[in-house]
């Protein structure tokens, strides 16, 4: 039975909601035999020839690994010489499968914070079912056991927690300690200093309307850095209690004796989106004579080694990485593989001048490169493709949106034939940049079968600096859909596909994109995949972490912003099939998603069904906001989605 009282769907684990979700999910899966595709995807995800990405801590390189025998994963380590050898010998530190079985818990590994310098203790984060909320437990790397709380071991109950080591017996912690300790978004509002065996002492308190408060301890300079996130794009920072007097919309990064800034609007001669640096002491004494390190390209990310700053930039969505010597600011451009996107995957001031870079493209598998003090890169590992890439190429096109803005998109496939089924991704929010990247899953299930894949760079992302994002927030949010529609129309105009051959797909904010497209311009495509979406935008700020996103979407309690949101909120713009026929939609979510509430997906699927529109629904019982918690779940969900797309817009050419 599809019909249900919508309010019942707000309760994550209530019997009526779970029964409704399970029955509809089972019906969706039953219509599609995904076993063969699932098996092939799972084999690629579990393959031993994948690259084990590493992080250096002292003399060891650490890695977390999942495969067919270890579905929940192994936390392990090795030496550099062994890692670079043809066959690597790994030392297992924690077997999460064994732990979950021993404790009868649905544990998902969420990371480890290891005690700097000695590297013999860790604060392990474990999630039930993949949720953002974690339990934190102290782990002894020498005995390979958790430290008993009765013996002074640090243990923090399940919550959205952040932690940082100060020394062997002291940590900084922000967690849910009850009323008055978390923000309206559900994140820590306080930071406390906790000494082993003693009580916590609060050192900083934010405000309920903040997104979060966090702190870290710099073991090199022996100082505490506290950050108060006012919203998603504004924050304030204190170093050992001293406020850094920069604008709220300016990212401030204190490092060693310098202060690096990335302003979203011009500040002290540093242009919006640029990168500036000044002596930290001089700044605190009133100096504002910044040195501009980068202003000609979009700064995508920063990373530090012992003696250098690594700057990753984008120019027309093409990657460059520079190594800049600290203090002299002498710059060396890294030589990256041709036609590849690259990003720094590991670097640390505590790991000398070593750093690691991953490079790939839509058609070229990932290469892992090791860098040194000279900026030279040496190949360490190279992953093979698990699908046939012959005949595939990528093109970049530019289109004009409704307000005249030009934006690019990539299209990948075999261009030797005519129009064919085309899958269009997209995100368009939160300053997230979409760059070319290799995916065995997409290759196996789509590209190898003859389909085109389109990746648009919509406004709202970070590909072209702060203004590329700020142009489409709050009352201008509709422009994201104008960009998306322009891309779909261009794909058709260039002869790549007819509208009925196009499927759109997006998750999270991308699920808002595709659900909004479904109700705004359904004539432009033939199917929509809507994953872990936001759809109920008139009350999103009251669900899970929704209050933290009001700087992006607007405040539904503000009359002007509410009026704007109401024009595009997907749930509130569903129309009956007698008025307009929507293409088929597949709506997916996870019961354990504690970031975007499953009610967004549940109520939207219900609204489509009640309107007589074609809709399928699938809810994974685990997985958190990622939608899947292990390779078995990923292969299950991905196979279902791709077979559903094939069923709706036609199987690509063999």
Model-derived features: where do they sit?
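Asp-box/WD-like beta-propeller blade repeats and closely related beta-sheet repeat scaffolds
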Residues: 89-111, 123-126, 130-170, 174-185, ...
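Solenoidal tandem-repeat scaffolds enriched in leucines and small polar residues
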Residues: 164, 169-239
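Beta-propeller blade signature
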Residues: 76-80, 137-142, 187-197, 238-240, ...
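Blade-edge beta-strand/turn elements of extracellular beta-propeller
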Residues: 90, 141-156, 197-208, 238-243, ...
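Active-site-proximal cap/loop segments of hydrolase catalytic domains
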Residues: 456-654
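Long hydrophobic segments that form regular secondary structure
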Residues: 205-271, 280-284, 580-582, 587-613, ...
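Cap/lid segment of the alpha/beta-hydrolase catalytic domain
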Residues: 98-115, 126-131, 145, 150-152, ...
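Non-catalytic accessory segments flanking enzyme active sites
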Residues: 15-114, 125, 189, 212-229, ...
